[in-house]
């Protein structure tokens, strides 16, 4: 870990000098222990282990061994880069085993705080440099033992390690809490947008325009203004299908000027341009009748997202449409396409579509059924006013969502920023000033490293005794 001037009382060392790497255990075969596969190791800083209880005889061979207060982390890609690491806590009888793709770091006689050591392996510096020092084939690269053993570390005194670990737990819990709250907002905004659409198509969004007119309950069990009408989509527009590629033909990434709209692009009321593919000219000529015009509406008719609807934007004028969707075109002069899009996307119509798909045998929305789908129809002038109000409210929601995403980006970088401050000594500067006796003399990091060295020398050559519950 690179760094400038060390804080007072700190010293430099390596992981190999500070702790034991992948030490072995000798336990009674009938001892209950925890077994934790890679999936049980969290990626978040404050995540918990997920393990099951097994007999030691079942897991003592062919797995990595560890005990309470060991720090374990994944050494294989992409688990290493994803930050799979944890301090072992509350395992049955204090012992466990798991994937052979773990590295285990064990403090020597408690002279290194395991939670501080865990913070070290979660830093960006450790993860970045570890990823650059992998060996093996693609998809099976692993952090090398040489990198791990020789990784340089700025070491605080033991008392300060504890303070750093506690501060990190507190600060990063606050980060997680903030992140969790921010991550809830997009779902709240999604519900808000749907509630706006519902209010738009049942007259509540413009109810002040109907002070003199009563609302009526329709056969759709929706209360709407008495001046509004109920009809069918086919009475006000044509419904036509898209077209699959001719047999043996395929799409290409090169922009030929003939875009092909696939079902996966039909989202959020529009056509998403990401991953756009194209037709070669000779193929397009053979299916040229199955194009869309800007302002047409689309609705998906098969697949997991059946019923997704929206408007074809200008940039997709004359594009070909997938056979997995239909277009609604040639609209009557009494219907505004943007209002029809709101109706198609409303929970009222989506519930009708979903109910029929679930009860039907084909799992497909037939063109004839689209024509017969109900349509709530306000006066044309009010349709335009409804759309204006909806778009205004959606713009507010979009602004909030953008601010939330920017805040999430900042929050996501906070963890590494805080960890970097911790290993520069910035989180504990005041503590050091208030506790000089805990960072100097025999309490200094230099003295601590000498103790570790002495303990290691004293324990060298001694066999590990068999442990019992």
UniProtKB/Swiss-Prot annotation:
Homology family: Belongs to the type-I restriction system S methylase family.
Among InterPro entries, the record links this protein to:
Restrct_endonuc_typeI_TRD, Restrct_endonuc_typeI_TRD_sf, Type-I_RE_S_subunit
Concerning SUPFAM superfamilies, the annotation shows: DNA methylase specificity domain
A further note on this protein reads: Type I restriction and modification enzymes are complex, multifunctional systems which require ATP, S-adenosyl methionine and Mg(2+) as cofactors and, in addition to their endonucleolytic and methylase activities, are potent DNA-dependent ATPases.
This protein is called Type I restriction enzyme StySJI specificity subunit
Keyword list, A-Z: DNA-binding, Restriction system
Give the molecular function GO annotations. Answer: DNA binding
- What PANTHER family does the record tag this protein with? TYPE I RESTRICTION ENZYME ECOKI SPECIFICITY SUBUNIT (PTHR43140:SF1), TYPE-1 RESTRICTION ENZYME ECOKI SPECIFICITY PROTEIN (PTHR43140)
Which GO biological-process labels does this protein carry? DNA restriction-modification system
């Amino acid at each position: 870990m690179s760094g400038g001037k060390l804080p007072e009382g700190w010293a430099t060392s390596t992981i190999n000098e500070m702790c034991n790497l992948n030490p072995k255990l000798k336990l009674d075969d009938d001892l209950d222990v925890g077994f934790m596969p890679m999936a049980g190791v969290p990626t978040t800083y404050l995540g918990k282990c997920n393990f099951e209880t097994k007999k030691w005889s079942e897991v003592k061979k062919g797995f990595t061994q560890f005990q309470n207060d060991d720090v374990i982390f994944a050494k294989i890609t992409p688990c290493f880069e994803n930050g799979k690491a944890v301090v072992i806590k509350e395992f049955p009888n204090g012992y466990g085993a798991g994937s052979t793709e773990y590295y285990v770091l064990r403090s020597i006689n408690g002279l290194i705080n395991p939670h501080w050591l865990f913070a070290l392996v979660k830093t960006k510096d450790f993860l970045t440099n570890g990823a650059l020092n992998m060996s093996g084939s693609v998809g099976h690269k692993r952090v090398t033992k040489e990198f791990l053993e020789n990784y340089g570390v700025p070491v605080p005194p033991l008392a300060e390690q504890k303070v750093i670990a506690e501060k990190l737990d507190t600060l990063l819990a606050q980060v997680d809490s903030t992140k969790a709250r921010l991550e809830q907002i997009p779902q709240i905004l999604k519900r808000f947008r749907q509630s706006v659409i519902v209010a738009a198509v049942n007259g509540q969004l413009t109810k002040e325009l109907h002070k003199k007119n009563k609302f009526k309950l329709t056969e759709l069990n929706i209360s709407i203004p008495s001046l509004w009408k109920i009809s069918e989509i086919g009475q006000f527009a044509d419904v036509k299908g898209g077209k699959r590629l001719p047999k043996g033909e395929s799409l290409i990434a090169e922009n030929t000027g003939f875009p092909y709209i696939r079902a996966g692009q039909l989202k959020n009321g529009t056509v998403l341009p990401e991953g756009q593919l194209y037709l070669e000219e000779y193929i397009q000529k053979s299916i040229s009748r199955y194009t869309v015009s800007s302002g047409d509406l689309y609705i998906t008719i098969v697949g997991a997202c059946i019923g997704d609807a929206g408007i074809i934007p200008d940039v997709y004028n004359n594009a070909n449409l997938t056979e997995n969707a239909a277009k609604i075109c040639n609209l009557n002069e009494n219907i505004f396409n943007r209002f029809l899009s709101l109706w198609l996307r409303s929970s009222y119509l989506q519930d009708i579509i979903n109910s029929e798909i679930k009860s039907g045998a084909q799992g497909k929305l037939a063109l004839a059924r689209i024509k017969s789908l109900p349509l709530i129809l306000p006066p044309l002038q009010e349709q335009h006013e409804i759309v204006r109000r909806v778009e205004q409210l959606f713009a507010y929601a979009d602004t909030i969502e953008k601010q939330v995403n920017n805040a999430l980006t900042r929050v996501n970088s906070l963890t590494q920023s805080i960890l970097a401050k911790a290993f520069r000594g910035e989180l504990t500067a005041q503590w050091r000033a208030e506790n000089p006796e805990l960072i100097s003399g025999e309490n200094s990091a230099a003295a601590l490293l000498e103790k570790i060295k002495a303990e290691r020398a004293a324990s060298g050559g001694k066999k590990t005794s068999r442990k019992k519950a």
